């Protein structure tokens, strides 16, 4: 049986995670949050004092990537994420760990180590894959390819609200600077830079609600022969 694959790529804070989860629930597909994998690897390398030694200890870092002890659990509150048995669901969503992930994602050998791990998520009846290079690198054969973007300013405002909702302190200027720096790093890296696939459906969510974007996505996905 052919596995239907929907990819959602785009920059940090564009709403990919929320919409990918909604699509996965709507179509009853599996869900891959590839950003969580990079955040988990970045956090693990930081805990083992390897994040600042990526160049000199690359082989060791690659081994950590291949043996990463992670688990995803679906609960009433959403998806819980565990690293080495510890619940790190909120920890990996902090700006600090986002920076770790961006550093890790810039290393070709670490991206390759996570490649097969991501491919393994493609199981029947289908998969919604959320990330930066899902359509361009990991699942180029995807049935439906979406590139979700928004202005840096609107993404910063959303991120501040998200962090404040988690009880964390957040300053708009700091968040905006971080987003702009990550955009630059993600778009300029040598391997799998952030960009839409040539056949991607591009949505700018700057002035749209989650429900409006979701409807656009469902209409597009259905037009690509993925049926509910």
Swiss-Prot record:
Keywords: ATP-binding, Cytoplasm, Kinase, Nucleotide-binding, Transferase
GO molecular function, one term: CMP kinase activity
Name by which UniProt lists this protein: Cytidylate kinase
GO CC terms, sorted: cytosol
InterPro entries per the UniProt record, alphabetical: Cytidylate_kin, Cytidylate_kinase_dom, P-loop_NTPase
PANTHER family, A to Z: CYTIDYLATE KINASE, CYTIDYLATE KINASE/PANTOATE-BETA-ALANINE LIGASE
HAMAP family: Cytidyl_kinase_type1
SUPFAM superfamilies reported for this sequence: P-loop containing nucleoside triphosphate hydrolases (SSF52540)
């Amino acid at each position: 049986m052919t596995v239907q694959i929907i990819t959602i790529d785009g920059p940090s804070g564009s709403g990919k995670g929320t919409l990918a989860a909604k699509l996965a629930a709507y179509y009853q597909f599996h869900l891959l949050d590839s950003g969580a994998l990079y955040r988990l690897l970045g956090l693990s390398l930081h805990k083992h004092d390897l994040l600042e030694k990526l160049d000199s200890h690359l082989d060791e870092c690659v081994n950590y990537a291949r043996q990463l002890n992670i688990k995803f659990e679906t609960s009433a509150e959403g998806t819980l994420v565990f690293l080495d048995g510890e619940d790190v669901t909120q920890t990996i969503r902090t700006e600090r760990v986002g920076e770790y992930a961006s550093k890790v994602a810039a290393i070709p050998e670490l991206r390759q180590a996570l490649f097969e791990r991501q491919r393994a998520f493609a199981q029947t009846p289908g998969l919604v894959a959320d990330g930066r290079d899902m359509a361009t690198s990991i699942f180029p054969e995807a049935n439906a390819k979406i590139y979700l973007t928004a202005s840096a300013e609107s993404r910063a405002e959303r991120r501040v609200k998200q962090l404040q909702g988690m009880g964390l302190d957040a300053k708009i200027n700091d968040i905006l600077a971080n987003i702009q720096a990550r955009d630059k790093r993600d778009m300029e890296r040598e391997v799998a830079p952030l960009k839409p696939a040539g056949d991607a459906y591009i949505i700018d969510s700057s002035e749209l609600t989650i429900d409006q974007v979701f409807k656009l996505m469902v209409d597009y996905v259905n037009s690509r022969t993925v049926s509910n």
